[in-house]
A protein has these predicted regions:
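C-terminal target-recognition/interaction regions appended to catalytic cores
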Residues: 65-173
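Class I S-adenosyl-L-methionine
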Residues: 1-116
């Protein structure tokens, strides 16, 4: 199962085992998104209504309306204010790295003079604005441990953005 095929805005592949005693009448869910179905929910679709932030900034008001099915779902019942939308504060060198990268690029695409010397291929990597996110990990806001750099704002993801990419409604506390 890949969560992106069911309207979740991230690639998240998992194996699901169903154990049943007796009759085998379990009906597996049918994917709702993908080729020939609804389009995948992209990063832009999922977080495009949130205010732009710089490193260390926060915001409490939505920047746009809930203009798609996903946003109407996550914003239902949330009111007028957005919570937990604060960007982690980063140092000047990391900010320069994040500003240099383009959509989908990683540390391997950086000039030698600012390229981190260690880390896996998907570290210090920028997400794609027009695609679903890669799988979220517990370090979803740490550029040195995952592909988590915001493609528009050149910063790490906020908690609200991480929650959105897991389809957690905005009113969840």
């Amino acid at each position: 199962l890949n969560a992106v095929d069911f309207g979740v805005p991230q690639q998240r592949e998992r194996v699901i085992l169903v154990g049943m005693k007796g009759e085998n009448n379990y009906i597996f869910p049918v994917p709702t998104h993908g080729p020939g179905k609804k389009p995948y929910v992209t990063l832009k679709d999922a977080i495009g209504d949130l205010p732009q932030l710089k490193s260390g900034e926060s915001a409490s008001h939505y920047a746009g309306v809930a203009e798609n099915e996903f946003l109407r779902f996550v914003r239902a019942g949330a009111g007028q204010l957005v919570t937990e939308h604060a960007a982690p504060k980063n140092g000047a060198h990391l900010i320069r790295i994040m500003q240099t990268l383009q959509d989908g690029q990683s540390k391997d695409d950086l000039p030698e003079e600012i390229r981190p010397k260690s880390g896996y291929g998907n570290t210090y990597a920028k997400l794609w604005w027009e695609r679903p996110s890669t799988t979220i990990t517990r370090n979803f806001a740490c550029p040195s441990s995952s592909r988590c750099i915001h493609p528009r704002d050149s910063r790490a993801r906020s908690i609200r953005e991480g929650a959105r990419l897991q389809s957690v409604p905005d009113d969840y506390r």
